[in-house]
Regions:
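Glycan-recognition and catalytic cores of secretory/periplasmic carbohydrate-active enzymes
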Residues: 2-121
């Protein structure tokens, strides 16, 4: 949604969709992060990180950039996975959460995630 809202805003200059995306991103910023009482895990899709960066670029709100970085840094740190399992759901690979982003050298998990890996290289 964030990428679409930014594209719509850049193409039309209209803020209606962008304002909805901002409201949603603000909720993410209030809910996720390293601070006490917030959820400290990475989302299942890296799409949110890309979208938050694009929102930052059009709004200048650094919270979006910071949250995107937090999500990327959180990958590979969730301690409830069974890292020895070959099952991608049990070891975190399905969600690209099996090891830190900078250590991921191949696209794994659901096929849609291959585009995120390629876009970030």
């Amino acid at each position: 949604m964030y990428e679409a809202a930014v594209a719509h805003y850049l193409a039309t200059g209209k803020r209606s969709f962008l304002d909805i995306a901002i409201k949603s991103a603000n909720l993410l910023c209030e809910t996720f992060g390293p601070e006490e009482g917030k959820i400290t895990v990475a989302p299942g899709h890296q799409e949110v990180e890309i979208g938050l960066v694009k929102l930052y670029r059009v709004t200048g709100d650094k919270r979006y950039l910071d949250l995107s970085q937090f999500f990327l840094d959180a990958r590979g740190k969730y301690d409830k996975y069974d890292r020895s399992s070959e099952d991608q759901f049990r070891n975190g690979a399905y969600w690209q959460d099996h090891k830190p982003v900078l250590e991921q050298d191949e696209a794994v998990g659901h096929a849609v995630r291959a585009t995120y890996k390629r876009r970030t290289l």
